[in-house]
């Protein structure tokens, strides 16, 4: 196998595992509990534009390397992705980042939504955006913990 074929094969393997993670996220019953709508939108904002899902893929590959059925590792893989995502949401707040992967950060998106209502001044809109961002991360953290607690 050539180096290019190996790289293509690896990227295809990553796509497959990313699909497993995304399919699980779409079907998990817990997402119906994420209310109000702003929290739901915040929880899924980074997950919709996620990268290669490397961390969960490492878990899948490790499972397969020791003879396990990779797809059975999906709840743990999803928990890893959620855990990583909530730390990014909180990191963006701490660093006061306004963009992530070319899109607005969670807290910036909700700051802007608050301003767009015409009911918030700059200070209150900023507070609202940060509050939704923190709650978004906390919901993702709880979701990850819930998935891990069901593994045994």
Predicted regions located by residue number:
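Mg2+-dependent prenyl diphosphate-binding active-site environment of isoprenoid biosynthetic enzymes
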Residues: 29, 33-152
